[in-house]
Amino acid sequence: MTTAQTTELDVQPTPLALLLLGREADPRSERGVECPGDLPSPSDPDLVERARAAKEKLGDKVFVLGHHYQRDEVIQFADVTGDSFKLARDAAARPEAEYIVFCGVHFMAESADILTSDDQKVVLPDLAAGCSMADMATAEQVAECWDALTEAGIAEQVVPVSYMNSSADIKAFTGKHGGTICTSSNAKKALEWAFEQGEKVLFLPDQHLGRNTAVRDLGMTLEDCVLYNPHKPNGGLTAEQLRDAKMILWRGHCSVHGRFSLESVRDVRERIPGVNVLVHPECKNEVVAAADYVGSTEYIIKALEAAPAGSKWAIGTELNLVRRLANRFAPEGKEIVFLDKTVCFCSTMNRIDLPHLVWTLESLAEGNLVNRIEVDKETEAFAKLALERMLALP
């Protein structure tokens, strides 16, 4: 991308947009952070060439996956790009690749390990690249929730549906209890399937995707949904509330999409007459209701590809992707702006930078396996069961 082609979005920086880097541990997940002493300097002018050389040396032994929310400096080295589930499936379709370098976050690398063969090794360039939403539901908390459902006498009626953006432990719990996984693209089908299996759904960890899908796609009311807070006894709900609910939503959210507000939508409509507002279903219900279009990252990309020249769009999703789309479609006369006025990067996605990628590729090229993500066999078996149920959805 040349400087002349680059489109700058009108956003203001905020100190809350990016977490401080270089901690010894992720404060939420307590995952260790590997900061090797030989990590290249970000100012090294040869970083791009070093990454290219190491990748060339590895050849078909390495397959680099790049999530849509990654930095441009990283995404340029991805063999494929996409959302988390697409990337995991792409990895499984490349059995000749000994190393899968996942430029994404921890739960994505876990999913890739679950779906790839035992001979393949999944690597995450920075072990602290977690997901705050995935970390909002731990195995212990979900087990306590199931106990509350059992005490309310409804556990046998409940089918768990877990978002792809969850840990391997939560996917395994879901598989063990007869549930399925969903993505933002197939959440409607997953919920329809779940309600064919039982009378109620426990949806975790993203309350907004669960609520939006139930209300927009299945015709439920907000009153059909209750919010389970894992930090309160019995989730802060009475047994009667649990028995009356159709959707039991986990109190989790995406820190990026949760920033978009109704005020953001109103403001952009005032600033840009005729703008189309397109948001991700992880946004709050009132934001989704005020938008013109709602869909996954893949949906957003396809919608902009099909949009007519001269159309105007305000996008409510992660800023790296929005910037990339704005630059891509600017030559076609499509005006694309970020929905919010402040920077809204995914802070953990941004931990994967070019120095970490270079260090990873050079280490692998030298025969040193670093930052491997490996799911234990029992967890893998139940998590894979839940994923296979999703793959079998019509």
Where are the language model's segments positioned?
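Active-site loop-to-helix "anion-binding N-cap" substructures in soluble metabolic enzymes
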Residues: T2-G316, N320-P394
